[in-house]
């Protein structure tokens, strides 16, 4: 778990309609310190890190296996408050550490793909989130988070997700896709619809993330994209668990959440680097909007 560190990178930029199958590795970091407004917030979903790889499985180059080690951290809206000062209506402290295994299938025309992911992990002190955030804050000279003694302990968990993305417009510079997904599991249960808009002279229509394939480009290649996401929340055990006492839930979750994501990606030969900004509407009634950034890198092997 000591390998988790707040560093960078998410990847991108697919290429021609016929892509060489390849193996790749990536590192992806998310943090609200990377807020586009210029000031870190350290609240709600405050940091995440993923280290993983993707490997093509057969000669037709249409199926891929992905595997990643991930960690996510959540804190209250004010990390300098002591445990006894925290409001039950604020976001709870929580850490998730988990292993994800995915299976990705493209159709022959490269106009659609389907992805299935299973994640197995743990929460609470065994996630290592408290230790890692405190050490990172000491290294960068930031405030020490004081509320980790109240972190949620939900035990081990399992999450499953199925996602389907289809291209509806692929004309020269402009690409438009639609993504639908459902996530079910011990903690998060939701349904998502998200159109994708991409400006890119490349023939590949999709937004290329670190868990997507990319093809090697001889010349530097730039891609700009936007992804508004609409989410129906069925359940969120992070917000619907009262860590202080039993009884009714202290927070009223919002059933509909909106997230806007905007990214820019640069690919140089077999290396892809991406910078992304996310903005979320409040997840529960007493919450406020939240912004965080993401930086990632993928390398073809």
Q: What are the functions of these language-model segments?
A:
Residues 71-213, 234-252, 279:
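Outer-membrane pore/translocation modules
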Residues 35, 77-82, 202-301:
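Outer membrane beta-barrel transmembrane domains
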Residues 35, 39-48, 71, 93, ...:
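Histidine/cysteine-enriched polar flanking segments
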Residues 22-60, 64:
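N-terminal ordered "arm"
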Residues 1-24, 301:
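Bacterial Sec-dependent N-terminal signal peptides
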């Amino acid at each position: 778990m000591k390998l988790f560190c707040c560093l960078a990178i998410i990847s991108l930029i697919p290429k021609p309609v016929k892509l060489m199958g390849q193996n790749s590795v990536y590192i992806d970091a998310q943090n609200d310190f990377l807020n586009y407004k210029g000031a870190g917030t350290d609240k709600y979903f405050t940091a995440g890190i993923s280290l993983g790889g993707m490997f093509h499985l057969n000669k037709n180059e249409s199926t891929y296996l992905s595997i990643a080690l991930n960690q996510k951290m959540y804190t209250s809206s004010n990390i300098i408050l002591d445990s006894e000062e925290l409001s039950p209506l604020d976001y709870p402290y929580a850490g998730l550490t988990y292993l994800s295994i995915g299976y990705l299938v493209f159709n022959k025309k490269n106009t659609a793909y389907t992805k299935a992911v299973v994640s197995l992990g743990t929460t609470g002190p065994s996630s290592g989130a408290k230790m890692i955030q405190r050490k990172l804050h000491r290294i960068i000279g930031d405030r020490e988070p004081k509320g980790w003694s109240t972190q949620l302990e939900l035990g081990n968990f399992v999450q499953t997700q199925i996602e389907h993305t289809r291209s509806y417009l692929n004309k020269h510079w402009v690409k438009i896709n639609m993504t639908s997904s459902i996530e079910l599991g011990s903690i998060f249960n939701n349904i998502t619809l998200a159109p994708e808009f991409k400006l890119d002279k490349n023939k590949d229509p999709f937004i290329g993330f670190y868990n997507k394939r990319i093809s090697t480009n001889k010349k530097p290649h730039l891609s700009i994209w936007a992804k508004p996401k609409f989410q129906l929340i069925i359940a969120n055990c992070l917000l619907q668990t009262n860590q202080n006492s039993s009884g009714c839930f202290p927070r009223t979750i919002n059933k509909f959440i909106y997230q806007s994501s905007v990214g820019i990606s640069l690919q140089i030969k077999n290396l892809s680097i991406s910078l992304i900004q996310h903005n979320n509407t409040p997840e529960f009634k007493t919450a406020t909007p939240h912004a965080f950034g993401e930086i990632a890198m993928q390398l073809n092997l």
